[in-house]
Regions:
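Bacterial N-terminal signal peptides that target proteins for export
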Residues: 3-17
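Bacterial N-terminal signal peptides
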Residues: 15-25
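Sec/Tat signal peptide C-region and signal peptidase I cleavage site
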Residues: 27-31
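Extracellular/oxidizing-compartment recognition motifs
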Residues: 32-445, 457, 473-474, 493-497, ...
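Active-site acid/base region of carbohydrate-active enzymes
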Residues: 153-166, 171, 385, 393-430, ...
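Non-catalytic C-terminal accessory modules of carbohydrate-active enzymes
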Residues: 179-180, 184-202, 344, 612, ...
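Solvent-exposed loop and edge beta-strand segments that line ligand/cofactor-binding
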Residues: 309-312, 376, 442-455, 496-508, ...
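Alpha-helical support elements that line or immediately flank enzyme active sites
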Residues: 319-338, 386-391, 455-485, 515-525, ...
Length: 822
């Protein structure tokens, strides 16, 4: 690589004519930076020379150091832009950083001691920036890597900066995936093209010879032994310390530049071996699929084109790993799909392959002829099917192995549900798979198409997580990110992190409900208090849009409520031009929850103000949108249209009087002329079903999920057929409903301090399950006793009490196990 003068990494300041590995100070710029960890000097950000900070870049960096003996702990903090994988003596120890934005950039804390040994040790990192091809969810300041020792002992040996070695890896190129090419909106990662002839095989191993790599060195060292000059930290630009946001220091002027680092708030992602199930078809080569089990090689002769269709048997997220020998100048193309399609792009039963092909995201690997070379993409792929196309040149290619490394947020499945209706168990597995692969460092609407964390999706995903896993950390992450996304008007972004701002005002109302969900299931008044400024800003924005009718007037932005055919872009009548009963009711829904939040933290005046505002909105909707002749609420008083969405919101907000809600819900279910709710808004339909006293009909409303199973789906789709995405966790909400409605386990007070168990068995004669609770597990075993009786065996965690409700009867519940007959 030529050594030429270049622009430095630090905020437009130029180097003094020297080629540099760019270094950015880890503290605000001044001549004598203050240590940030236990006396440790600050590390520096490093990046390759001659590469614009916003361009596609993959680089490797290494640091060799000696230890007389291995300490009990050797703690470092590590980050990168866009992402990194960190190795110690050849073993991977960390990856990240956790996704966020530049002003809340994350770092991981890792104890390297288990991988160290006396003598020579090597830390190595793979770092990449997708550049212009980066996914919409990916924020970026510029390419860089940072490793900071926790104390002066670690810092002296391994702080990134002077003495590290760096190599740009020219083997990588992005395969840009466009929405136009995909035939639908695509916002996720590009594919990888990896040329084995250019790849520095073994770069992460301690015995690799890195002597030809660039050295990060002080600017005064310009000899051949140290061909790269470090950027002088005192010259300008920097970031706050790793441990916490730094207080102002003498000479500071409050300027914020570059990455503002904060610790990782969630655990490392799960990574486990996952083998493809089978070869469904093959042309150009014969195989029994042994290579998928690493039990025998697939040998593709020279000058051969072979195509294999591989089936995982279920949708998944995984890093594809290919191990080959020989085959110089050959090409292996992997194309990933959730389902196969016909020539018109239509899906059928997900097991069906006849007359169908794979279209989608792809990677290309080019073996160089070496032995046992292992290709792995920098990021994971989402798929059920993988099409493997191999074209060989003058040498045969030997494929030893092709497998995946499954990855997802490490949710454990603590909850369980069993009943005398067997297909519910199949649905549970489908839903939970969709929920798992819809969660990584954030929740994701779809892991294949977008990988974006949307408010509407996330509220449902968060409830599933709480009820099935009991882990609230990813939900806290989401609430914090949506709070950070707020624009000056007061609204949250519809999705965050996102490098492209999108505003869906109704999602801001759903955000209020999400904060309330957390309040009811976890309490944590300090966390809730921190969110209240955002909640108030949202509701104040809506208050400014209430017109003289008492309903919401015209509203800007994208007023999406639900994907349903009669509504263009999912926007209900009246949303854009005024008087949407649907969104006015959603506003009232949020006001009620905000009132409870304010009351819960002692803000009684604010709570009463929200109740008053809610009552005013509901009165306006009743007087203007109620159609007494139809016995339904119109979507807007200015149109003659009716929907499930509007009428279930009328039930959930008590716009419909309590005494009339059951009859209204019956009409919602039976009137086929109504605009129907999608899988997403079906969550609110089923919540209204319970509130209207019809929860015994919950199971019968799950017919669409039976249909999913009949189609061979292994995760829940975005919409009914034809659906873009086969994995959309917003449709996995019946796992929540089985626990919260059928078993009937819900908080009776904030923080889940007390429990309400109100079962609704419907057609079931037996149901049992477990719901994780902050203090332990709630176990419920129910058996129908005759036509109207119930035998309930219930165990509550220590310190938790509650109430059992059944057909108008109530029984107090204590901690521990108890048997109740009603």
């Amino acid at each position: 690589m030529p050594m030429t003068a270049q622009r430095s990494m630090t905020h437009g300041i130029r180097s003094s004519g020297l080629a540099v590995v760019g270094i950015l100070a880890a503290t605000p710029a001044r001549a004598q930076p203050t240590p940030i960890f236990d006396g440790a000097p600050p590390a520096s950000w490093i990046a390759p020379p001659g590469v614009p900070g916003d361009s596609f870049t993959v680089f490797h960096t290494r640091k060799t150091f000696e230890l007389g003996k291995v300490p009990a702990r050797f703690v470092v903090h590590v980050s990168a832009d866009n992402r990194y994988r960190l190795f110690v003596n050849g073993a991977q120890v960390s990856s990240g950083p956790q996704r966020s934005d530049v002003t809340h950039w994350r770092y991981e804390t890792v104890d390297l001691a288990p991988q160290l040994h006396p003598g020579r040790n090597v830390i190595a990192a793979l770092v990449w920036n997708w550049g212009a091809a980066r996914p919409v969810a990916q924020h970026s300041h510029r390419t860089g890597f940072l490793l900071q020792g926790n104390s002066s002992a670690e810092a002296a040996l391994v702080n990134s900066g002077y003495g590290w070695r760096v190599l740009v890896d020219s083997a990588y190129a992005p395969i840009v995936i466009t929405s136009a090419a995909m035939g639908n909106y695509y916002a996720a990662v590009p594919g990888d093209s990896i040329d084995g002839a250019r790849y520095p095989w073994g770069w992460e191993q301690p015995d690799y010879d890195d002597s030809a790599w660039y050295i990060v060195a002080p600017p005064t060292q310009t000899s051949a032994a140290a061909p790269l000059a470090a950027f002088d930290n005192a010259a300008g630009g920097g970031i706050v310390g790793l441990a916490k946001r730094r207080a102002m220091q003498p000479g500071d002027y409050g300027e914020v530049t570059g990455w503002q680092l904060e610790p990782r708030s969630i655990p490392p992602m799960e990574e486990t071996l996952q083998r493809l199930a089978r070869v469904r078809r093959a042309t150009g080569v014969t195989t029994d699929g042994a290579f998928l089990r690493a039990a025998g090689d697939l040998v593709v002769p020279a000058h051969t084109t072979a195509t294999l269709l591989l089936d995982q048997s279920h949708t998944t997220n995984a890093y594809p790993v290919l191990e080959t020998s020989g085959g110089a100048s050959s090409t292996v193309r992997l194309t990933y799909a959730e389902a196969l399609v016909d020539s018109a792009g239509r899906k059928a039963h997900r097991d069906s392959i006849g007359g169908r092909s794979v279209r989608g995201v792809r990677d290309v690997f080019r073996p160089d002829g070496g032995a046992h070379h292992r290709f792995q993409t920098v990021y994971w792929r989402s798929f059920r099917y993988v099409q493997m196309e191999i074209v060989t040149a003058d040498e045969p290619l030997r494929v030893h192995d092709l497998h995946g490394i499954y990855t997802a947020y490490p949710f454990s499945e603590r909850a369980r549900f069993a009943s005398d209706l067997p297909w519910l168990a199949d649905m549970w597995r489908m839903n939970w798979n969709g929920a798992r692969i819809g969660a990584f460092e954030t929740y994701m609407d779809t892991p294949y198409w977008e990988q974006l964390q949307y408010v509407g999706d996330t509220r449902i995903q968060g409830l599933i997580s709480l009820y099935v896993s009991g882990d609230d950390r990813l939900l806290r992450q989401a609430i914090e990110h949506f709070d950070l996304s707020r624009i000056p008007e007061g609204l949250t972004a519809s999705r965050y992190p996102s490098a492209v701002t999108q505003i869906i005002p109704p999602f801001s109302l759903i955000y209020v409900a999400m904060v309330h969900d957390y309040y009811m299931h976890r309490g944590d008044s300090a966390f809730v208090r921190e969110r209240l400024a955002g909640v108030r800003g949202i509701l104040d924005w809506y208050a400014r849009h209430v017109d003289s009718t008492g309903m919401l007037g015209p509203m800007p932005h994208w007023n999406y409520v639900d994907w349903t055919n009669p509504w263009p872009r999912g926007v209900p009548p009246g949303a854009d031009h005024g008087h949407s009963a649907t969104i006015s009711l959603l506003y009232a829904y949020a006001l009620q929850r905000a009132a409870e939040l304010e009351a819960g933290v002692g803000m009684r005046g604010a709570a009463e103000a929200y109740r008053t505002r809610r009552a005013s909105v509901l009165a306006a909707v009743r007087s203007r949108a109620w159609d007494a002749k139809r016995g339904l609420f119109r979507d807007s008083p200015d149109t003659v249209s009716y929907s499930q969405q509007t009428n279930v919101l009328a039930i959930l907000t008590d716009a419909a009087p309590v005494a009339e809600q059951r009859a209204l819900m019956e009409r919602v279910l039976s009137d086929t002329t109504l605009t129907r709710a999608s899988y997403y808004f079906g969550f609110y339909v089923l919540e209204a079903l319970r509130k209207a006293g019809l929860a015994d009909r919950y199971i019968e409303q799950l017919a669409p999920w039976q249909g999913m199973l009949r189609l061979g789906l292994t995760s829940t789709p975005e919409n009914p057929e034809p659906t873009r995405s086969d994995t959309h966790a917003w449709a996995a909400h019946p796992n929540y409903g089985l626990l919260a409605t059928v078993l009937g386990v819900r908080p009776a007070s904030a923080g889940f301090r007390t429990v309400l168990i109100a079962p609704s068995l419907g057609p079931l004669r037996r149901a049992e399950g477990r719901v994780p609770h902050p203090r332990g597990d709630i176990d419920v075993k129910l058996e129908a006793d005759g036509e109207r009786g119930l035998r309930a065996e219930i165990t509550l965690p220590a310190g938790v009490t509650g109430v059992l409700e059944w057909r108008g009867q109530r029984r107090a519940l204590r901690s521990g196990r108890q048997v109740v007959r009603l």
